[in-house]
Amino acid sequence: MPPLPLEHRPRQEPGASMLVRYFMIPCNICLILLATSTLGFAVLLFLSNYKPGIHFTPAPPTPPDVCRGMLCGFGAVCEPSVEDPGRASCVCKKNACPATVAPVCGSDASTYSNECELQRAQCNQQRRIRLLRQGPCGSRDPCANVTCSFGSTCVPSADGQTASCLCPTTCFGAPDGTVCGSDGVDYPSECQLLSHACASQEHIFKKFNGPCDPCQGSMSDLNHICRVNPRTRHPEMLLRPENCPAQHTPICGDDGVTYENDCVMSRIGATRGLLLQKVRSGQCQTRDQCPETCQFNSVCLSRRGRPHCSCDRVTCDGSYRPVCAQDGHTYNNDCWRQQAECRQQRAIPPKHQGPCDQTPSPCHGVQCAFGAVCTVKNGKAECECQRVCSGIYDPVCGSDGVTYGSVCELESMACTLGREIQVARRGPCDPCGQCRFGSLCEVETGRCVCPSECVESAQPVCGSDGHTYASECELHVHACTHQISLYVASAGHCQTCGEKVCTFGAVCSAGQCVCPRCEHPPPGPVCGSDGVTYLSACELREAACQQQVQIEEAHAGPCEPAECGSGGSGSGEDDECEQELCRQRGGIWDEDSEDGPCVCDFSCQSVPRSPVCGSDGVTYGTECDLKKARCESQQELYVAAQGACRGPTLAPLLPVAFPHCAQTPYGCCQDNFTAAQGVGLAGCPSTCHCNPHGSYSGTCDPATGQCSCRPGVGGLRCDRCEPGFWNFRGIVTDGHSGCTPCSCDPRGAVRDDCEQMTGLCSCRPGVAGPKCGQCPDGQVLGHLGCEADPMTPVTCVEIHCEFGASCVEKAGFAQCICPTLTCPEANSTKVCGSDGVTYGNECQLKAIACRQRLDISTQSLGPCQESVTPGASPTSASMTTPRHILSKTLPFPHNSLPLSPGSTTHDWPTPLPISPHTTVSIPRSTAWPVLTVPPTAAASDVTSLATSIFSESGSANGSGDEELSGDEEASGGGSGGLEPPVGSIVVTHGPPIERASCYNSPLGCCSDGKTPSLDSEGSNCPATKAFQGVLELEGVEGQELFYTPEMADPKSELFGETARSIESTLDDLFRNSDVKKDFWSVRLRELGPGKLVRAIVDVHFDPTTAFQASDVGQALLRQIQVSRPWALAVRRPLQEHVRFLDFDWFPTFFTGAATGTTAAMATARATTVSRLPASSVTPRVYPSHTSRPVGRTTAPPTTRRPPTTATNMDRPRTPGHQQPSKSCDSQPCLHGGTCQDQDSGKGFTCSCTAGRGGSVCEKVQPPSMPAFKGHSFLAFPTLRAYHTLRLALEFRALETEGLLLYNGNARGKDFLALALLDGRVQFRFDTGSGPAVLTSLVPVEPGRWHRLELSRHWRQGTLSVDGETPVVGESPSGTDGLNLDTNLYVGGIPEEQVAMVLDRTSVGVGLKGCIRMLDINNQQLELSDWQRAAVQSSGVGECGDHPCLPNPCHGGALCQALEAGMFLCQCPPGRFGPTCADEKSPCQPNPCHGAAPCRVLSSGGAKCECPLGRSGTFCQTVLETAGSRPFLADFNGFSYLELKGLHTFERDLGEKMALEMVFLARGPSGLLLYNGQKTDGKGDFVSLALHNRHLEFCYDLGKGAAVIRSKEPIALGTWVRVFLERNGRKGALQVGDGPRVLGESPKSRKVPHTMLNLKEPLYIGGAPDFSKLARGAAVSSGFSGVIQLVSLRGHQLLTQEHVLRAVDVSPFADHPCTQALGNPCLNGGSCVPREATYECLCPGGFSGLHCEKGLVEKSVGDLETLAFDGRTYIEYLNAVIESELTNEIPAPETLDSRALFSEKALQSNHFELSLRTEATQGLVLWIGKAAERADYMALAIVDGHLQLSYDLGSQPVVLRSTVKVNTNRWLRIRAHREHREGSLQVGNEAPVTGSSPLGATQLDTDGALWLGGLQKLPVGQALPKAYGTGFVGCLRDVVVGHRQLHLLEDAVTKPELRPCPTP
């Protein structure tokens, strides 16, 4: 309401008195005066403080961390520049390595004095140098000249200097696999063979892999004869000749023998390994037989009608049963001896069984002392110490006062030292007494020593003495050396508080150290190292601070007294334990006490007051009060100090909480307790992985990852002892403070390090003792070793030092000291020693030579080459000749080669480096051209020099390394940029002395991967057998692959990186595969476009290999399946994208990477030697990485090798003594390029202007456009868009969704994004109050360039695409400014931000396409030079021409662009083909036979998906899997069958399951069966799989998997029957007749989890995707073998109607039922497989094993055809022909000549009979017992159908026929039971089979068989009514147990019988 006008306002307010108004006037005046005075005072104050020219400035911002995000490799660390704080560089650590002489060999073929020097060289050279082995390079294998026999094997010593022949002490962990010994005995493994040979001292060696006689165990097969193939040694099951059909059609064979028929002849020939041929039909005649008797085992052979005796027919099998003959020769079996008799035409009688060469062992009669074992070394007996012990720590104290880890280690040391050492007592010795403050006991001297070496770690700590130490290790070393008590007071540098340092967690407050209090500690008691239980970890730290003592957290939970419960014995003696504790703590145990059994009766009132400080930080009035408190609390409590407790607090305790890790700069680690040391959880235990025993804590240096190691402990993770230290185990077992110093005597030891388990040092010859300080009697240890002169020199005049040592007078004695290892930086280059070994530098060479007492001098600077002649003590000639030659031939620097005498002058181009504009601070050698040198006397020396120019000993293992950025740069080809010309190097074609890996040789390796090539043609390379493979790859080593045109160039950097990764991965896979024994190398030949990337590789094998291309492909597929999934990603299905072909033999060599194209090779071969060729592929060194090396400034590298034939660069060279002019003097850079000299004239680089490129800027480079692949991005500096932004962008997209641009705020809501969503551009931004969303109306067309423009001003924004009317939008009101602080990401975002960006923009993928222009605020971003402009990039490529422009698709079809310039047309309905040009579908009409489904491929073709039973391209081949032949499924490891789920076959499968499977395995592992609940591997499942030949039955009911594993491994190549049973949570597994293995799934307290819920299909033999199977099944590969039977409660599942899908499954043709020779069952019988054998189901009218017997029809009215009227019950004895008793039931006496044995416990039953009836019910046959619920077997008619039912004691089985029998016609019935399996066949129907549940296999009966019914059924049998009804009808031709039953004569009870009437 507006105020009233002044004139209308009333003069007085109603209700206001005059008195009030009177007093209001002066108050208002007072208020006005007060305000006026206050304002004046403020003005005066401002004027008095104001000074012109002075103003406040904000504090300067904290300078950014220039090292953040900068990665340094190979041990270098980032350091900011002192001169320019805004710049940083990677530098190597300056600290010196320890002076420890422990030579090691690096992968660069150089010897370093210790591992630290190797790592230092690796950092300085910025290249990967791996530790190949301990000991110097070039040292010979100590086992090379040692021959071990009689079971022993050669084992080199730890220092690699000597070797011993040792017998295997245990075979645990050795590879299993039966081997055949030379004595003809099978052994479970080769290790056990050697162990037996050692024990018996017999000369036994491995003869073959596998058993000596593979046919052993197959002799009992009545249907087959086993023969061992002599070539493959595989058993072959051949049919017996006696089983041939009884056809009398005699034929005459070419051996002069008449055979019954052709079947008999062929089978007899096959069993003898012969191909007998038919000469004529009928009997053999006289002219077909040899005229004379063949002697000496020769066999008659008829060829061209001329019979003669021949030895060619004496063929022997491959079984090994050695026979020693009289001629002293051992034959593999007696047949080979007979063959030798035939060929030599003389008698060679056998001498004895077994081999002949059973020479007695030289060890017979040899007695070894000190526990040594006699072994045979080089044919002589030697006593060797078996140094291998189990490693179980059970310390004992020896009689020498030394503690040994076990009795075995004591005996081993006694043997090694050659002295008698007895076990003095159990437990460790204590020769030093108590070593305090972290010192360790030195047993030899009995004194305590301090480990002094610490690994540098940037983790300073503050000690309790107030000093800062570089690391916790340095603190403990200081405490040990000064023998003082010192603890870590706090992490970081010491901070003073007043005049003192706050320790043990105290904080500084107001100049005083105050212990923080725990206000609200998290619950959870912890046990402190003082034995006190604290309520929380916070209270533990508070107590440590108050008491000023070190208290660590021992473990979570309360402290359990060691006296009670710690042993976990569970003996129930808690009362006794509590009584003991009560007494120990001053109490009295009284069980009758009302206050508790432990009575604390202390009277402390009369004790004089004397305050004491308790260990809990509480002050007690007297010590008595403390003891009373200890008794009442039952806690450890003791007097910490006399007097009142004094904490560090000089003020009352403040409620200061310990700072939580969340308040630290980098937040918390994953444990939510430890503070992170840097971004990305740097320094956290989860990323450091520090060894808990070797490190002080789980944290590490965030920059280097170095953990804080204990003294003497080294490694990044503190997991090993440093060189010169040993006994890491002592830290764990004995609580040592660190590793123990080796303390090797430098006078007697060769090295300063020692064996890690024993501490033994490597001694010089003649020196003994564990520390190499002992000499034989009468000698003393001097500077030359053990010396006879007892006089000790006093002055250096009396001593002569050798091997580079210098004399030093010290402590009154003179001694020789070897030189130090440290060299000045100027002399830190590699040198070649006179022994042919490369050393890290000259100082290391001298130190190693001195310690090893070898005369080694420096041969030359730089690494040794192949032509250096080795020699430890070179002669003067060998030393002077090369130098003399070099002085004449090298008038200018060593990196260029002069003309040799007599050669002509040539023009040489200026060498160019690979990467232009590169300044390197690390020394590099540049490769210069090499001239052809005539083969003069100096040829070898010139060759050596030429080789050194082109090679600088690259890493031998470089191709497989993850950090390869420096390997090839340091090699000649990499740094110089030129490759040696073909034919320019003259090399003597002798066998080179291999000093390093051939990868360091100038011409690389041959195809065998180990022979260095001597020339460009590979003339010295051995032949290989090559297989060419084609692989479709999706990724390698975790990196996704996308094809770009640069991959086609073998010289490109991208090709080199990709080839390295692929070759390294394939090499690892093949070396662990089934073909590894013959594998040599793999080389990438070509990369090309495919579905993703197509790689063509050549895999080289031993030329004698028996492997075929299919073997190579299968082996690689198996390895890909079982290897880690990111190693090599191949397109699915694997078998379609991994193909191998035979490629013939290759004598050609391949170098370290690949060979390049054929054209390039041809060019190289045709090039003359006078000029360096433009393209040479021979040395194929991979290009370097694009990552920036240490200490260099790198311009963008070119992707192609610069040409070397430009004429403007050629200039003559003449020999002379002057230095060559600088490379840039001739101004070689064109078009304004800037030339820069490299390394003092060794080369130059051109820095080209924009738009120019090439080695001399001669090429015009089109503007580069970045291409994005959906997971790529470019990062630029943050947008300046607080209030205004204008942006324009041009892009081309291949997909309708993707992120174009994004910039956000890391801590707030603000962001700006530009994205494609549903085919339209969307602009989003959020200023903090909510997002604004602007969507364009113009659809984005894939493949077309679009331009968008947007603007934003405060909260308003506009968007326009392709000139459309701008779309306007506004963000919600609230905040207006846009605060951005992250990088501007273009084309995508980093992976860690995907979730956040997806939530804000609804787009989680990047752009697939190109961006060619980006304008921000009228300033265009240089995308053409994005490599330099972007601050970060990932996966960005070059944008090329679009494959879909113009549109190649017909009919307006949409073109979808693919990688590598390919496209895919999405054809509309009615169009087909790759370009939609065909209007007719290739599937119309359907070309697939058998109505198989047809699928149209994207390439335009058709693919037929063949069902089970058909194969071929169009399913035109019908496989004989149905009908008369049974189907046995053959799996190859990648095939599988998909069936209906198990739950569809059995209703109550969830409760219980009984399954049986019969299979034959070829491979040791694979999936046999799997059925799950869900497709993602979660939920319930059941599986059966092979794991290393062990069967594993697994199932999960919801709480966890039950794993039931067979006890014994199964045999490969044999049929195996397995039974599975599950009832609730309990399961059982039984293999064959073996024992049952029981198991149970986990139990749940809340839910029973007893039901198996299955919903998915059943997979047999494999699965389509193993990653989607349950993890509990633990399967990753398919089954290789044959599956014969999968039976679920007797129901066969392997039938066509149950199979839903079959992939690569073929029928097995090597079973008697499926073989090509035909059905073994005659007269139309059905063959039923029974594992390796079979059974014939005969049709009506036939019987016998092969249905060969016809039944004789009885005459009408004969009593053999009986009639039954429903009351006729006839009893017979259960008669069989052969006894099949499994228990000891005696057979009854024979009744008469025709009576048979009566059986009561039967393993099998067989019945055949013919019946005729019209009845629908009735019991036909019964056998069983009369007891309640006893076993039985019955044939009955139920509802007109015949049933066979039997019960073996577990559960009845009912088999029902599908044929009606109540037809009044004669039908033949056949019923059979074998163990638990049964079958029923009526007439000609297919047999109905079934199986009883897992359990009993025999039928227990009373010995009687009833026909026609029973008077009364047994009680308790739940049988249908039909079983209680008698049979009405006729029976005849009854067969019991394959024998005819005489119905009248064999009857025991004979009621009135009558014949069956005629129908």
UniProtKB/Swiss-Prot annotation:
GO MF annotation list: acetylcholine receptor regulator activity; ATPase inhibitor activity; BMP binding; calcium ion binding; chondroitin sulfate binding; dystroglycan binding; heparan sulfate proteoglycan binding; receptor ligand activity
Result when mutating residue 1755 to A: About 62% reduction in cleavage by neurotrypsin
Name this polypeptide is given: Agrin
Effect of residue 1751 to A: About 23% reduction in cleavage by neurotrypsin. Reduces cleavage by neurotrypsin by about 90%. Completely abolishes cleavage by neurotrypsin
Glycosylation positions in this chain: 145, 672, 827, 957, 1726
Domain SEA: 1023-1145
Result of altering residue 995 to K: About 30% reduction in cleavage by neurotrypsin
Organism, scientific name: Rattus norvegicus (Rat)
Site positions per UniProt: Alternative splice site to produce 'x' isoforms: 1143
Effect of residue 992 to A: About 64% reduction in cleavage by neurotrypsin
Segments of skewed composition (Polar residues): 1216-1226
Laminin G-like domain: residues covered: 1263-1439, 1526-1708, 1784-1956
Consequence when changing residue 1726 to A: Abolishes fucosylation of muscle agrin. Stimulates MUSK phosphorylation and increases AChR clustering
All copies of domain EGF-like, residue ranges: 1220-1258, 1440-1477, 1479-1516, 1709-1748
Effect noted on mutating residue 1876 to E: No effect formation of AGRN-LRP4 complex nor on MUSK activation
Chain spans, region Disordered: 951-980, 1173-1228
Keyword Calcium belongs to the record: yes
UniProt: Ca(2+) binding residues: 1831, 1848, 1898, 1900
Low complexity bias locations: 1192-1207
Extracellular side: 48-1959
